[in-house]
Structures are given as structure tokens and as C-alpha cells.
Amino acid sequence: MRNLPGGGTLAGMETAFTELIGCRVPVQLAPMGGMCTPELAAAVANGGGAAMLSLPLTTPAEVAATLDEVDRLTAGPVGVSFLVPFLDRECLAVAAARSPLLDFFYGDPDPELVAAGHAHGALVSWQVGSAAEARAAVAAGCDVVVAQGTEAGGRHRGGLPLATQKG
């Protein structure tokens, strides 16, 4: 796992998320495909947050090159997000061995994918769009559940705003 520059958290900002991920503020950059460049991810990580890269339809060599660039720009926590329908297991292995956090989206929570991430030492999160999907992510062994309602914009799985979801 990466060490965060400056160490510690901001006073009063300690949460289970900051402790688990190793960031200073409980903010995670959404893994917006094409928008989350190594430079943006590094800016978020260097500012104390957790950053995510979306790397769909890439090769293992491209994943490694992107993570090399991230390593050059930050020592902060930068994870990699995968769209389940386009998942390449070799890319997953490269990312899991080099990133503190893997994120999955657009697929039902899958215990095998969670176990694959954990086997390489990564934490695993799953983006969900309903309370039922959140329960499935917990049952699959995810370390983090990212609840996303329709107000998130972009692609989402849920059909309701997050505030209307009941547990």
C-alpha cells in the first residue's frame, strides 16, 4: 500500500474510510472513464483523498504504464476501477499487485473477483445502486461499498436517488 505524503489525517477527519484506505480526508475521486488521468488522480491523492482510475479496454502493459506514471506523480492511494463486462483478468492481476484498492462496477457483486483482488493484497470496493446490491457486495466480501444513486450522473445501476434507498 502507498504511503501518503505528510502522513496522518486532518484533525477531525478521521473515519473508518481514511483508516482503511490510508488517506487523510474521506474523499474518493470517482473513477470516471477517460476523465481520470494520472495527473488528476495524483492531485487528489496528494491533496489527501483517495483517487481512482478507470482503465476499461486496456492491456496489461497499458495498466502497468499508467500505474508507472501514477507512481512518478504521487505516493498517495490510487486505486483502479474495472467495468465488469469488459474485465480482463490479466489487467486485474497487474492492478491488484500495484494498487491499494480495486473497484468494480456494472456487474453483480462477485465473490471470485473479490477473492482475486484480496489474493494480490488489494482492498476491494463495489459500486452499487440499491440496498439489495449493497448487501450482496458485503456478502461477497467487499471491503468498501460505494452507494451510487441516480443523482451521481454518468452511468449508474440504480433507478432511484440514493436518499430513497432503505437498507
Regions found by a protein language model. Name each.
Residues G7-G167:
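Active-site entrance/lid segments in N-terminal catalytic domains of soluble metabolic enzymes
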